[in-house]
Amino acid sequence: MTPFLKSLTKRPCFTVSSTSSISNVIEKLSQHNIGAVVVTSEENAVEGIISERDIVRHLAKSKVINGLIASDIMTKDVVTVMPSVSSSELMQIMTENKFRHLPIISNGELVGVVSIGDVVKRMLEKYEAEAEQMRSFINA
């Protein structure tokens, strides 16, 4: 597991069941200031993902969310990543597919979620460290 993804698996991963109400999903997104929740089974296997954009898209189409449950609007064919994926691979997957969140899976179970913000922050840290090394080299 890369140190970057290892750090992400130590923070809370917010999930809902497929039968959770959309109101509950929205409350969880708002309460934890997150952009997506993963829909999981009782065995912690990924069944889907619901992002803020999924909710907005649904509202734009039908204008109704009362009475809906997670399985009604979740993205079912979820792209996931293994803990061994690199930051550059994450950036490529997320950019090419226009994803903002990817579940991290180990042994068939959800162990974390990586966001595009996490990837950008990691890449900035990497480039800042490289710039500092170059400054040290030049000043030596």
Regions found by a protein language model. Name each.
Residues 1-6, 19-22, 33-37, 53-57, ...:
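Short acidic/polar alpha-helix capping motifs at helix-coil junctions
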Residues 1-12, 51-82, 86-95, 116-140:
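Tandem CBS (Bateman) regulatory domains
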Residues 15-33, 39-40, 80-98, 105, ...:
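The conserved cystathionine-beta-synthase
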Residues 12-15, 45-46, 80, 109:
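Short, flexible active-site loop motifs that bind/organize anionic cofactors or intermediates
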Residues 29-32, 37-53, 94, 102-117:
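A glycine-centered beta-loop-beta connector
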Residues 7, 17, 102-104, 108, ...:
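Generic signature of intrinsically disordered, low-complexity segments enriched in small/polar residues
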